[in-house]
Regions:
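Terminal amphipathic alpha-helical/low-complexity segments used for targeting or macromolecular assembly
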Residues: 1-106, 167, 172, 178-179, ...
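Structural signal for interior beta-strand "rungs" in well-ordered beta-sheet cores
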Residues: 41, 102-194, 202-330
Length: 362
């Protein structure tokens, strides 16, 4: 990347800078790896302690750190270090949305599509009939926009992203490689009542249903996605059966997540890696689902709910709950159960001892 001075970087971060503000910075590193010309990111005490192992002249520090005692020539101070990383990494990212506006000659673009100014469209991409693509779009290679889809301004669609027909996406959308939006939902039915339906209704009894083939229920709905949404690599969002699947504004979805048909997700939710949300479930606003959380179908998860990793949600969750475990329960309850389970071997031994003593007395 082109170099940036300490003064310029501090201004970009709305941060305070001290020392030699004319030092040039070409990148960032952890303190022990930082060489001259790199900014040492030392925003917590363990990292500050390792500054002496590297050769950094400039460091990003939390407010209040004595920078002069660290043999630095300059420092940038921030109130909330992790938040500062968002601005810092954006400023120093050499690969983000690089390249001038152009359309690669191998791209296939339907003449009825509307592509606004500033678009960069990579090799072997396909834009279907009636597509509307907003300003300053950045498309990698092998990106597909299905017929009738709409994508707002400033989208970033990395290599291999597939957007199905009639999908509607808001402003500043980011899709990491391999994202698929608008594939058919997982929806099948048998002619007669199947064993799995009996099990679902009775919680265990298969009944006398005979094996039989399954028939596809086609997905006639689409997908709607709000503004400032990001989807991680190889995540999938299925189209609705009749109505649309909906993801609210500000949601961030990690890699390898599955969002089923008819799901509704509110605003500003965090969906971590390997989460699965089954069909027709609804999430409120500001929900956080830890990695490998599973949400069963046709459930409601209220606003501000947080689930720990690998939680399995099998029933509705009221707003504001913090959940953990399989099945999901209040985190403090689950932790109490876990602690008591660890005590079981000792309790069994104690019970056996007491039983033996009583038998001897008899």
């Amino acid at each position: 990347m082109d170099s940036i001075t300490v003064k310029e970087l501090a201004h970009a971060l709305s941060a305070e800078a001290v020392g030699n503000l004319d030092i040039s910075i070409t990148g960032a590193a952890e303190p022990q790896d930082a060489q001259a010309g790199l900014l040492a990111v030392a925003t917590s005490e363990p990292f500050v302690a390792r500054l002496g192992e590297g050769k950094a002249k400039v460091a990003l520090l939390a407010n209040g750190v004595d920078w002069r005692s660290l043999n630095l020539e300059a420092a940038i101070f921030v109130d909330r270090p992790r938040y500062a990383l968002a601005g810092l990494t954006l400023k120093l990212d050499n690969n983000w949305r690089q390249g001038k506006a152009f359309i690669h000659p191998s791209a296939v673009i339907d003449p009825t599509s509307q592509i606004a100014s500033g678009a960069r469209i990579g090799a072997f991409s396909y834009i279907g009939a009636g597509v509307v693509l907003g300003k300053n779009a950045w498309l990698g290679t092998h990106v597909t926009l299905g017929n009738g889809s709409f994508v707002g301004d400033d989208p970033t669609l990395l290599d291999g992203v597939k957007i199905g027909q009639n999908v509607i996406i808001g402003q500043r959308f980011v899709a990491q490689p391999g994202v698929v939006i608008g594939a058919d939902g997982f929806s099948y039915v048998s002619k007669e009542v199947a064993a799995l339906e009996n099990v679902r209704g009775t919680l265990g009894d298969r009944g006398d249903a005979l094996p039989q083939p399954y028939h596809r229920i086609h997905s006639l709905g689409a997908v709607q996605i709000g503004d400032d949404v990001e989807l991680g690599a190889n995540s999938c969002v299925d189209r609705g059966t009749i109505r649309d699947t909906i993801i609210g504004s500000g949601c961030k979805v990690d890699n390898l997540a599955q969002i089923g048909h008819n799901v509704i997700i509110g605003d500003n939710c965090l969906i971590c890696a390997q989460v699965g949300i089954a069909g027709s479930s609804t999430l409120g606003d500001n929900v956080v689902l830890g990695g490998q959380t599973g949400v069963s179908d046709n459930l409601f998860v209220g606003s501000n709910v947080i689930t720990g990793g690998a939680t399995k949600v099998l029933a509705n969750v009221p707003a504001g709950r913090v959940m953990l475990g399989y099945p999901a329960m209040k985190m403090e309850t689950q932790l109490d159960i876990y602690k008591n389970l660890r005590r079981l071997p000792a309790l069994v031994k104690e019970f056996a001892r007491l039983k033996s003593e009583n038998q001897k007395k008899d």
